[in-house]
């Protein structure tokens, strides 16, 4: 378990609190500012931005549900571009930007008419395109650069293309809402219980702020949210949520940890600054990307489309 004196140094490297001779005052200050220091954000602004994004998504799903595809496509493009910038600035990686951007959009848009065949076909063509695009720069750094391009391609557009698949059935709006609500419940439960009761670090070398107590909150809130959504939105057996909830929460938390690991490796705090109070859009997409394919699969299995 990390001590209270070490946390301020890790979360805010330039802060003098950790080096203060008055350890009692330093601990009190750290405890008093816990909500903002743990989030590292302007909380009111972050909440306002989050509510605005939620309103746009909700209106689109309740009016013309196909507009969800455009939201996914734009979000994937922004997230992909943020990853490009972070990898290039921090590590000098030369990515296959054009093939990944074009191929990523193809996967998302072709998932609507062609399903998994459209996703797989676009993925294969994009992989070959990445090889050819990077080949023109020579052998130096080829494996590193192509590997990073594959990471971006699979992490963002490939995973998010399954978010498109969620909206395809007639009850697609309810499926997308179920997916989003479970992930939001997971984030909310993890933040709330982690802030209140967090004592045991979950992955101290990856994300020191995450605790097992917070993970328990994510499981609890996510499972309750999943059960309610399955019963009320999808009109099916509520106990399916006992399966869907924990699995989606596990994927969402994994995505969050993966992004934390990438940022630590690159030595950066945020992927970008697109969203006021949040950082980059990838700070919001990380858990959604890794849970979208699993959400689609679980709902197809347990709540088959009509």
Give the role of each language-model region.
Residues 265-288:
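Interfacial loop-to-transmembrane junctions
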Residues 289, 294-298:
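Hydrophobic alpha-helical transmembrane segments of membrane transport and translocation systems
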Residues 297-306:
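Juxtamembrane boundary at the C-terminal end of a transmembrane helix
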């Amino acid at each position: 378990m990390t001590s209270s004196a070490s946390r301020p140094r890790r979360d805010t490297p330039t802060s003098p609190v950790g080096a203060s001779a008055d350890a009692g005052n330093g601990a009190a200050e750290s405890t008093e500012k816990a909500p903002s220091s743990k989030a590292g954000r302007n909380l009111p602004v972050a909440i306002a931005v989050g509510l605005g994004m939620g309103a746009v998504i909700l209106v689109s799903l309740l009016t013309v549900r196909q507009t969800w595809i455009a939201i996914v496509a734009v979000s994937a493009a922004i997230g992909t571009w943020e990853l490009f910038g972070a990898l290039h600035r921090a590590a000098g990686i030369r990515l296959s930007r054009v093939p990944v951007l074009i191929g990523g959009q193809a996967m998302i848009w072709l998932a609507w008419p062609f399903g998994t065949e459209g996703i797989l076909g676009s993925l294969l063509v994009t992989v070959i395109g990445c090889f050819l695009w990077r080949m023109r720069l020579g052998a130096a750094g080829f494996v590193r650069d192509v590997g990073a391009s594959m990471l971006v391609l699979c992490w963002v557009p490939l995973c998010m293309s399954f978010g498109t698949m969620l909206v395809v059935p007639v009850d697609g709006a309810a499926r997308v809402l179920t997916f989003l609500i479970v992930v939001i419940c997971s984030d909310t439960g993890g933040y709330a219980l982690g802030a209140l009761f967090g004592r045991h670090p979950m992955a101290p070398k990856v994300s020191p702020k995450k605790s097992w107590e917070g993970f328990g909150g994510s499981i609890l809130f996510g499972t309750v949210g999943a059960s309610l959504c399955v019963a009320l939105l999808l009109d099916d057996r509520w106990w399916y949520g006992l399966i869907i909830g924990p699995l989606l929460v596990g994927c969402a938390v994994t995505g969050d940890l993966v992004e934390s690991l990438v940022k630590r490796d690159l030595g950066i705090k945020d992927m970008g600054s697109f969203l006021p109070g949040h950082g980059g859009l990838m700070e919001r997409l990380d858990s959604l990307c890794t849970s979208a394919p699993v959400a689609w699969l679980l709902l197809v299995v347990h709540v088959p489309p009509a």
